């Protein structure tokens, strides 16, 4: 009854799961576990844990940010599709692009999107650093990333993709506050401004989460993002 558990949790936030959405989440779980046996998509495979720590965790940002509008989203380093695919299931009008550096994960996502019959999704095999220099630079309403690197690094990978007036939605676990302090210099250099922070608990004491909404106020200087690997090795920090 795990999908029913998810439905109950979302109902507390006035979100109703349709039968189609329930079926999509069940299919998502089955495909995730099946493909995980041949490639490393996630260390979390217990059914309830997937619903709690992947599906619910991916949808939770919608409690604080209005995804129920026709916006374009780019998800950087989404791995097995988190948070953007659960958000797409919940809000079908979203236009979703996922950028991931591992081609095997892109193959999984293509198969998943086909099985879930998702429209307006595209999956691109690229490094965020090179993707942020190309034609998609400053073209997305929202760019999201879920804890793939420290916030100072994530900002350099994500803010160049956000259009002026758009938002970077960063999802972190409990140590986000100290990362935010460290990242403020990079965020400013890259044209961003932190406008909202939200701290919330996952159900069943599964951990604290933090969400930062960063508005793109100015264009990102052309030299960012720097070449692949550099943001991680030498993050933009105040001297």
Curated annotation (Swiss-Prot):
In terms of superkingdom, the source organism counts as: Bacteria
Enzyme Commission number(s) of this protein: 2.1.1.-
Swiss-Prot/TrEMBL keywords: Cytoplasm, Methyltransferase, rRNA processing, S-adenosyl-L-methionine, Transferase
InterPro entries, A to Z: rRNA_ssu_MeTfrase_G (IPR003682), SAM-dependent_MTases_sf (IPR029063)
Its biological purpose is as follows: Specifically methylates the N7 position of guanine in position 535 of 16S rRNA.
Question: What HAMAP family does the entry give?
Answer: 16SrRNA_methyltr_G
Under the heading SUPFAM superfamilies, the entry gives: S-adenosyl-L-methionine-dependent methyltransferases (SSF53335)
Q: What is its main location?
A: cytoplasm
| Binding site residues for S-adenosyl-L-methionine | 77, 82, 128-129, 146
Provide the protein's localization: Cytoplasm
Q: Name one Pfam family in it.
A: GidB
Molecular-function GO terms, alphabetical:
rRNA (guanine-N7-)-methyltransferase activity
What does UniProt list as this organism's lineage? Bacteria, Bacillati, Bacillota, Bacilli, Bacillales
Annotated region described as Disordered, given as residue ranges: 215-239
Keyword ATP-binding in the entry? The reply is no
Q: Which organism is it from?
A: Staphylococcus aureus (strain bovine RF122 / ET3-1)
Q: Name one GO cellular component term.
A: cytosol
This protein is called what? Ribosomal RNA small subunit methyltransferase G
The similarity annotation says:
Belongs to the methyltransferase superfamily. RNA methyltransferase RsmG family.
Q: Does the keyword DNA damage apply?
A: no
Instruction: Provide the top EC class.
Output: transferase
Coding gene? rsmG
